[in-house]
Amino acid sequence: MKHPRFFIVILTICSIALCSSCSSSRYAGQSLSALADRIWLFSQDHPDGFTLAIPSMTEPAVGISVAYAETQNSHSHRQLRKVVRHALKHDGIVGGWFNSDDSLYYFDSTRLFPEDSLIPALRFAKQNGQYAVFILSKGETISVE
């Protein structure tokens, strides 16, 4: 190799950039189980339901919340880990809500649409087998049908 020092410098720069980007994430270093624990505890304080952005652990105030089909019917702490895993690979949003008909608390990986995008949100909901979408700013549920 003609320029080994150049190669070492580039390798060092890339390593530093990679490490700093990993540590900048608010959930870097937290296991999937630890994130699920935090969200589980959050759900205990929000018995009627919530929408939570995992990176900031804050509740978005606006948007149309639509659940992904892949995480439907998730009720237990173990199933919540699956929901968190899916959310981290997609939009970073988790939703939870209590169903008074069956007395179960549901967790979903959620996609958030802008509030002026009701038609695309309803289309996505239908594609994902959802019965409704939720408009966060209004606290309003809109039926898909």
In which residue ranges do the predicted regions lie?
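Hydrophobic helical h-region of N-terminal Sec-dependent signal peptides
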Residues: 9-16
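C-terminal motif of bacterial Sec signal peptides marking the signal peptidase cleavage site
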Residues: 18-21
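Conserved, structured core segments of small domains
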Residues: 26-145
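Bacterial N-terminal signal peptides that target proteins for export
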Residues: 1-8
